[in-house]
C-alpha cells in the first residue's frame, strides 16, 4: 500500500492507497515536539485500528509546510516501515508548469492540490483551500500554475478576534440564521461566516475578471463544505484533494 502524508500547520493527514483507491485516512494534530518514536507509535495505533501493519506499506510520499517536522517524519518512515519517503520539493516530478515568479516559494500543498485538481477536474481552475491560511490558486486553460492569493485562515482570524476583544466570547463557526445578528453571538457568527463567503466570492470574481476565463472552482479543507453550500462560485468540494495529488505525484516519480 502507498502511505501519503500531508503535514499542515494545524493537522497531519495520512492516507493509505491500494492502487488508485483511498482505503483509509486519518487526521491528527500537528505537534512539532513529538519524536520519530512517538509518531511511530501513533501511526502504528492508527494502522492497528483497521487491522493493518507497517509491513504492508510499499511506498511513502510526504507534502509538508512545516519544515522542522520533515526529518522527524522521514526518520519515522525509515525506522518503522523501512521506507525512504519521497518529499515534495525541488527535483520531484509534478508535471505542473509553474509560472510563479519564484517557483521554489510555492507551498508544496498548493502544488499538490493543483496537480490533483487538473487531473480530476480539468483546467482552467481555481483551488480554494480552507486551511490555517485560506489560499487561492489559479491554473489557466493550458494547465499553467500562475499563483494566487494567501489570506489569514478562519481559525487565525477568529482567534485574533477572541484574543483582542475581551468582551467577545468564543463561538462555534457556523452559518447564522440571519446576516443581521440580534445578539452578540449571532452577530459574531454573521460577521465571520458571511465575511469569509464574501472574501471567497470577491477574490474568485477578481481572478476571473483579470484573466478573462470561466474556471472550475474547487474547494478543499476542513470548512470547505460549510462555505460551499452558501455560494454558487464554488463548483466542487473535494476533501481528499491533497491526498489524491500526492498519489499522482508518487506515480509520476516511479518511472
From Swiss-Prot:
Residues that coordinate or bind ATP: 6-13, 132
Highest taxon in the source lineage: Bacteria
InterPro entries attached to this UniProt entry: ATPase_NBD, Type_III_PanK
Compartments, record wording: Cytoplasm
Entry similarity comment: Belongs to the type III pantothenate kinase family.
Free-text cofactor note: A monovalent cation. Ammonium or potassium.
Residue numbers annotated as active site: 109
Protein's UniProt keywords contain ATP-binding: yes
Gene giving rise to this polypeptide: coaX
GO molecular function annotation: ATP binding; metal ion binding; pantothenate kinase activity
Cofactor names: NH4(+); K(+)
Top-level EC class as recorded in UniProt: transferase
Annotated CDD domains: ASKHA_NBD_PanK-III (cd24015)
Catalytic activity: (R)-pantothenate + ATP = (R)-4'-phosphopantothenate + ADP + H(+)
Pathway assigned in UniProt: Cofactor biosynthesis; coenzyme A biosynthesis; CoA from (R)-pantothenate: step 1/5
UniProt keyword Ribonucleoprotein present: no
Membrane-crossing segments per the record: none
Name the record gives this protein: Type III pantothenate kinase
Amino acid at each position: 500500500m502507498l502511505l501519503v502524508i500531508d503535514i499542515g500547520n494545524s493537522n497531519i493527514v495520512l492516507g493509505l492507497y491500494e492502487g488508485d483507491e483511498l482505503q483509509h485516512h486519518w487526521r491528527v494534530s500537528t505537534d512539532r515536539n513529538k519524536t520519530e518514536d512517538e509518531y511511530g507509535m501513533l501511526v502504528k495505533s492508527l494502522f492497528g485500528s483497521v487491522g493493518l501493519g507497517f509491513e504492508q506499506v510499499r511506498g511513502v510520499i510526504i507534502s509538508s509546510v512545516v519544515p522542522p517536522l520533515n526529518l522527524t517524519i522521514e526518520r519515522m518512515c525509515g525506522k518503522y516501515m523501512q521506507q525512504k519517503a519521497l518529499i515534495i520539493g525541488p527535483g520531484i516530478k509534478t508535471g505542473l508548469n509553474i509560472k510563479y515568479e519564484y517557483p521554489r516559494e510555492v507551498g508544496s500543498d498548493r502544488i499538490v492540490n493543483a496537480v490533483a485538481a487538473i487531473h480530476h477536474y480539468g483546467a482552467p481552475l481555481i483551488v480554494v483551500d480552507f486551511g490555517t491560511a485560506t489560499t487561492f490558486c489559479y491554473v489557466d486553460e493550458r494547465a499553467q500554475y500562475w499563483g494566487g492569493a494567501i489570506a489569514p485562515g478562519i481559525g487565525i482570524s477568529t482567534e485574533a478576534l477572541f484574543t483582542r476583544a475581551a468582551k467577545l466570547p468564543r463561538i462555534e463557526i457556523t452559518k447564522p440564521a440571519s446576516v443581521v445578528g440580534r445578539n452578540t453571538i449571532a452577530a459574531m457568527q454573521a460577521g465571520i461566516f458571511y465575511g469569509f463567503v464574501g472574501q471567497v466570492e470577491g477574490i474568485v470574481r477578481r481572478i476571473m475578471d483579470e484573466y478573462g476565463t470561466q474556471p472550475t472552482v474547487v474547494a478543499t479543507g476542513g470548512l470547505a463544505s460549510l462555505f460551499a453550500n452558501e455560494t454558487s462560485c464554488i463548483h466542487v468540494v473535494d476533501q481528499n484533494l491533497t491526498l489524491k495529488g500526492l498519489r499522482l505525484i508518487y506515480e509520476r516519480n516511479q518511472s
